[in-house]
């Protein structure tokens, strides 16, 4: 039996989590494995119940589990707190640090039935596309030292440091190539090796790792060209391997091509494939409690959990196929519906996906 730490959190988190668990219960029955769901508070809910966004009991539960299924955290209720104590910073960042979740998988898929929601022209979209951004999360310019500000007046100077160890590049490259093996077998490494010394090392190490995956095709692209090519011809990409800052930008650009944050799943993993799986969107407090949130991102995050942390790839495929089948039938929540008067609510979308399984 696999043990799942369920951290529903705040806002729409509990609503979409309920639907994801409904789908997981159905898929475990279908495929004959067993999951144990253990719930704990996190984020604003934990501040209210325990006084901190990440209680020790929640952290202990996560450490004793095989994976973490996360909802969302944050909301206006806790915005008066110092930034370091607010749910977003005080819950997610410590979880990532504690479990060394250095690898971020961000899929961006345009389903054939939802191509109208994509901002690109129909001739560019075709029947849709499926891109996986693999982003290094714990190093690079966001974490580099020294950083600071010196001087005064017009001579004031601010600086940051970008740097990567060979080992850090190697481990994220392995994650990208391993993911590509489960997909179409193609990696595009995004760098700026023409001007940045850090990226020269990045490219060298990626080339070394590529030799261990002769069945995976490797291309290199400069980040400025990558941002253009994503909107010019997204079909050329499958797995995009990026450093922290470039991945931050590229993954958000790719995400917006899908047409809705309610479709975007995310996984953060360590070298043991232990991971935290969550929707890429936020807690959406403006619609929380109304039963209209799109649960697909949480459901697809659960599918990623099955694939990458638990080893149930066939079950993950079944969930993703059920989501696509449901959308093909024209069943949509308000955020992706062409005719909002025909939109289903959160629970109805969950029920439809279970039925499609």
Curated annotation (Swiss-Prot):
Mg(2+) binds at residues 224, 248, 252. Substrate binds at residues 96, 106, 135, 224. One of its GO terms (biological process) is L-leucine biosynthetic process. The keyword Zinc does not apply. Pfam families: Iso_dh. Keywords: Amino-acid biosynthesis, Branched-chain amino acid biosynthesis, Cytoplasm, Leucine biosynthesis, Magnesium, Manganese, Metal-binding, NAD, Oxidoreductase. InterPro entries: IsoCit/isopropylmalate_DH_CS, IsoPropMal-DH-like_dom, Isopropylmalate_DH. Pathway: Amino-acid biosynthesis; L-leucine biosynthesis; L-leucine from 3-methyl-2-oxobutanoate: step 3/4. NAD(+) binds at residues 75-88, 282-294. GO terms for molecular function: 3-isopropylmalate dehydrogenase activity; magnesium ion binding; NAD binding. Binds 1 Mg(2+) or Mn(2+) ion per subunit. Gene3D superfamilies: Isopropylmalate Dehydrogenase. Its cofactor is Mg(2+); Mn(2+). The record marks 142, 192 as: Important for catalysis. Belongs to the isocitrate and isopropylmalate dehydrogenases family. LeuB type 1 subfamily. Catalyzes the oxidation of 3-carboxy-2-hydroxy-4-methylpentanoate (3-isopropylmalate) to 3-carboxy-4-methyl-2-oxopentanoate. The product decarboxylates to 4-methyl-2 oxopentanoate. This is 3-isopropylmalate dehydrogenase. The gene is leuB.
